[in-house]
Amino acid sequence: MKKFLFVLFIFLAGSQVRAQEIHKFTATGFLEYLNTTWAPEHTTRWTNLSVVYNRLDLHWYPVKSLEFSAGVRNNFNFGPMMAGYYPYYTDALLKDYGWLNMTFNLAKDSSYLLYTNIDRLNMKWTLKKFEMTIGRQRINWGINLVWNPNDIFNTYNYFDFDYVERPGSDAILMQYYTGDFSSLQLAAKLDRDNQLTAALMYKFNVNNYDLQFLGGVMEKDLVVGMGWAGQIKGVGFTGEASYFRNLDRFADTTGQLVASVSANFTFPNQLFVNGSVIYNSRGTTGPAGMGTFVLLGNVNPKTLTRSRFDMFGEVSYPVTPLIKADVSGIFNPNDNSLFAGPSLDFSLTENLDLYVMGQLFFGKPQTEFGDFGQMYYLRLKWSF
């Protein structure tokens, strides 16, 4: 019932605008085929998964002050990997973490799944320096490229490389621009378990540094945080940190600090290098086995890593104007496990791309990256 009322509200709001006032409608998206070959650890049997994935992004601007947006993901997954991990893999794909369940099973069997997910459905209203967005949306408070302790609403999972748009939250976001480079944001969301996340953020600029401070609640925790983005002699320098303290045990807990610092630089020949570290005060200094499959986990800022300390590095280079090479890695110095992610991106035509990537996990059993084996991807993507 709540899903019906929410969708009805969005469309009734749009219907109040007269037809002659329609300003613009846009529709973009893509169609892709992604093949995954997985060599699990501790076995010689490889398995395979194929995905046909279509995305549509719709935007309607009936008048200058209103924007209605919808984003729809249509997925057809099939292959031996589906059958080998049925029904757990299917259940994970169909799980919607929003307050509204907008993930729909269209057809499934032990070896295939066809489903649709609406990850954007919102209305944005603008009045001079004030903006308000209501509905399923992406609230991005993160700064760093890999780990985002400030991103308490839609936490970025680095390993889920094929979902660049990121999941949305059923939320209300209000933003007031206090100046050319400053703003005040108030956001609140409910998840599938009716857990509330709400916070206030103030962003401003000092001496060419963008600074942000936030405070609020994330489910059962009080959270305060800050972040920055600037440069030191041409080197990009960013960071963010958040501190969490359980509200139910406020007096007898030490809380949890998660912080990440990053630096990046682009050379004149377009060689790009990026390095980052993350610290988790509640992380272990021993084997940091992740326990669940890294690609399907619903991470939050407290679970970006189970280790006390991780290091990230990346180097990318445009070999030609149409070919980009990239290699990245994450190292856990406590349990000596390693992730490596080499990739090649080919621009075949203006709207057609071929992407080849590996996600290679190394380490002893029960270490952070030691139990997943190697995954190889081939993706053909047409954008429109």
Predicted regions and their residues:
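Detector for outer-membrane/organellar transmembrane beta-barrel domains
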Residues: 231-330
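Outer-membrane beta-barrel "beta-signal"
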Residues: 313-317, 346, 352-353, 357-360, ...
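Transmembrane beta-barrel strands of outer-membrane/channel proteins
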Residues: 29-35, 70-74, 134-136, 186-190, ...
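Outer membrane beta-barrel
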Residues: 65-181, 363
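Residues that define the transmembrane beta-barrel architecture of outer-membrane proteins
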Residues: 46-52, 114-119, 126, 166-170, ...
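Repeated loop/turn-to-beta-strand initiation elements of outer-membrane beta-barrel proteins
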Residues: 25, 64-68, 129-132, 181-184, ...
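Transmembrane beta-strand segments of Gram-negative outer membrane beta-barrel proteins
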Residues: 20-42, 70, 182
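Residue-level signature of outer-membrane beta-barrel architecture
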Residues: 58-62, 124-127, 176-178, 203-206, ...
